[in-house]
Amino acid sequence: MPIPWVEKYRPKSFSEIVNQEEAKQILASWICTRFKAPQEFCARWAKRRDKEIKEARAVLLWGPPGIGKTTLVHALAKEIGYELVELNASDVRTGERIRQVVGRGLREASLFGYAGKIVLFDEVDGLHVKEDLGGLEAILNLIETAKVPIVLTANNPFDPKLRPLRDISLVVGLKRLSEDEVVEVLKRICASEGAKCEEEALRSLAKSSYGDLRAAINDLQLYLAGRKVLTVDDIKRAGERNPQLSMFEILDRVYKARWFDEARAVSFNPSFDWEQYFVWALETIPIVYKDLEVMSEAFDRLSKADMFIGIVKRTQEWELLSYAMELALGGVSQVKNKPRLPPFIRYGFPQRLLLLAKSKEARRRREMVVEYLARNLHVSKGLVNAEIFYVLSALAKKDDHVVERLARALGISPIDIKNLL
């Protein structure tokens, strides 16, 4: 079985990793400030002196799949002569298992004379707080107590469950590679494999990968399986990859778009959900645009887009949706006196969605009460919600028997019934 090219051509040093200069400098500065590292390495890469870098107990690298988060840590360990203790948080999830694997890795003596050890928790956003018993707590405890560098990676670091990790970690975003940078890497691989690849074909692979170098390399290996020539016609016959974008990437593309059509094009991505986008845009505009006039203009365009959405829902004239998207995407992006935006913007998770998540169980139990009353009183749920529920609430405050009977009928504790009513 052939070696996967993503492993065969994985960068072995910091200098081989392209387009991540800021992330490399921050990570190197953190290592050199808090731990031991070769002087030559620190002199070359440790350029940052930020207070938050010195105080961070761990580093959380984030970004879309395939841009080099894990590779960056591998290259760091090799460059400074550290042994890498690595585990994927999506595979090793329970607290006990995490402590066993990492604890054993830290206790065992190195056979190859490494200068130290570095722990990598890959894909920590794959943890599920309820199902994965103690996993997050175990990672937090290791960060607090371990005397070795700990690095975490995530595709989506702003998941609410990861807030405890964000609070004690230095959050570092990695950028997608540009089309030209991906093409250059693919050219080197073609040359190394002795394959004749048309530049237009490689550019097509790079374009459809949307900066996901791993995906582009995998595609190249697939196309060149059993052959030594790649043409643009080969790509056209097979069709192009359709990338999936997270909401954080969608927001980043909208706010950082250089022109109107670039922001508008985000809506053509298959993962774009305009209803979700409106919720996120409403809460992220003040984070991105600090100037009141710029912020006001962005909100004005978003509100006008929302008016079009309202008309669409009332009249079912869906052709008007395109006008809403023009305002909500291009309009919000291309505001007058738009400031120069930093490479990394810390988008907050919408409070509305957080509140809905927290109240989900209460809303489910209320729905159980409403359905029970509607079924037994032979009325609609709408009538129960509008009138009967409030009458029942008043009765329950005066007579505990009402609460007890409902609790028995629904299998819910009387305390929960009281809270619902």
Curated annotation (Swiss-Prot):
Keywords: ATP-binding, DNA replication, Nucleotide-binding
CDD domains named in the record: AAA, HLD_clamp_RFC
Pfam families: AAA, RCF1-5-like_lid
Source species, domain of life: Archaea
Keyword Coiled coil listed: no
InterPro entries assigned to the protein according to its UniProt record, in alphabetical order: AAA+_ATPase, ATPase_AAA_core, P-loop_NTPase, Rep_factor-C_lsu, RFC_lid
Endoplasmic reticulum in keyword set: no
Binding-site list for ATP: G63, P64, P65, G66, I67, G68, K69, T70
Molecular functions (GO terms): ATP binding; ATP hydrolysis activity; DNA clamp loader activity
GO BP field: DNA replication
Coiled-coil ranges per UniProt: none
Subunit structure: Heteromultimer composed of small subunits (RfcS) and large subunits (RfcL).
Entry function: Part of the RFC clamp loader complex which loads the PCNA sliding clamp onto DNA.
HAMAP family tied to this protein: RfcL
Similarity remark: Belongs to the activator 1 small subunits family. RfcL subfamily.
Name by which UniProt lists this protein: Replication factor C large subunit
UniProt source species: Pyrobaculum calidifontis (strain DSM 21063 / JCM 11548 / VA1)
Gene coding for it: rfcL
